[in-house]
Structures are given as C-alpha cells and as structure tokens.
Amino acid sequence: MKYIFSSFALYLIVSWTSESTAQTVDQAAEAATKKLFDAQSIGIELKLQGEYVGKEGDKAIAAQVVARGDKAFHALVLEGGLPGAGWDGGRYAILESAPLTDGRVEFRSPTDDGASAVLDENGLTLKRGERKGLLKRVERKSETLGLKPPAGAIVLFGGSAPNMDAFEERKDIEGMTAPTMFDGHMLAGAVTKRRFRDYQLHVEFMTGWEPQNIPWRRADAGIYMLSRY
C-alpha cells in the first residue's frame, strides 16, 4: 500500500487574465485573496468565531459560533458537548445575534423561547430561563495535524519549496495554460499525473474567511477520489 502525503492551502476565489499564458494571477484578485487569510485585517470576528464548551449546572453544554458577515453571528447550542465530543446529534438550539458592538455580541432565540447569550473575548455566557453557564472557546486539532511524511511516502505537494511537478498542466476554457499555484499554495482543480489504487492519503487544508457567503458560496476544500465524488 502506498502512503501519499500532501498538504494543501486552497485559495478558491482567484481569477486570471487571458492575455498571459504564464502562471500569474490578476493583481486585484491577489490582494483580495490574501485578505481572506490575513488574521490581522479580519480582527476580532475571527477571534470570536469558533467552538465553545462549558457546563449548564451539572450538564455539559457546547456551542459553535459562526460569523455571518456584517459583524453578525449565529450560535448553534449543542446539548452534551461538541460533535464527536459529547453531542449525540440530537438536541440543539440556534441563537441569532445583533451586530458586534464594542467587542460584545448579544444573541437571542428566533423562537422567543427566552434563551439568550452574550459573547466577548472572555467567552460565551448562555442563559436559558433560570439556567446560566459560561462557555470557553476551545481549539480542537486533529491528532495527525502537521504529520511528517513517513519513510517511503510519495510527497505530492508540500515542504519548504512546494511545486506542481506531480500534477498535470491545467488549461483554461480558451485552451491556454492556467495558473496552478498562487503565493506558494495550490489552486483548485489540480490532477495528479500518477494513478493510485491502494493507498493511505494525508492531506491538510486551509480555507479563506468568507462569512458573508451563506450558505454554499463559502470556501471549502476536498479531493475527488477516482476523479469523482
């Protein structure tokens, strides 16, 4: 069995000009794309988005806070903990927020069931009737994050000097050579030159900051196996 190792950071909102056959990217698109990954320009919204865990009385409770654009958020409140860490896939509630103001976000239930929450850099304070709990932000990481290629692995992309040698040349709709890399990262649509049958694949992704693109236009990342879903 082959071990295939690859580390990707996909910039999914990229355009290029048809005048050039070189691997260049339009300057306006380049600036816009870099901003999607610049934590400093994103600011506090990025710090507030994420997963929160705590207790409501003696029961575990968790929330996933998602930025929605225009400094607004929604929070998915999960009974028992986070997905894969206590939540059974059943009970949950959704809270919607007013815009972020002075580092503080206030949430209310759209069903007027009395649930509310306040979010700031200290955490998410959740109140439901007489019950109240403080949830703290956590960052979960895969056990294989940053895994180094084992001996004999086929490294498709990554390392200190990533290149596209393992991938086919791409053509745009006019038949001209299209960019395959941007700022050291692979663009979407790359296809390996080699074909594999029995393998273990390690891949890592980074996606851009697009809170306003709800629900299906946000950046995502994935791989087609066998050139299909």
Where are these regions (language model features)?
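Central antiparallel beta-sheet cores of small beta-barrel/beta-sandwich binding domains
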Residues: 26-119
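Generic detector of short alpha-helix boundary/capping microenvironments
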Residues: 10, 38-41, 147-148, 191
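Carbohydrate-interacting regions of secretory-pathway proteins
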Residues: 27-28, 82-229
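Bacterial N-terminal signal peptides
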Residues: 6-15
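Boundary at the C-terminal end of the N-terminal hydrophobic targeting segment
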Residues: 20-24
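Positively charged n-region of N-terminal signal peptides that target proteins for export
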Residues: 1-4
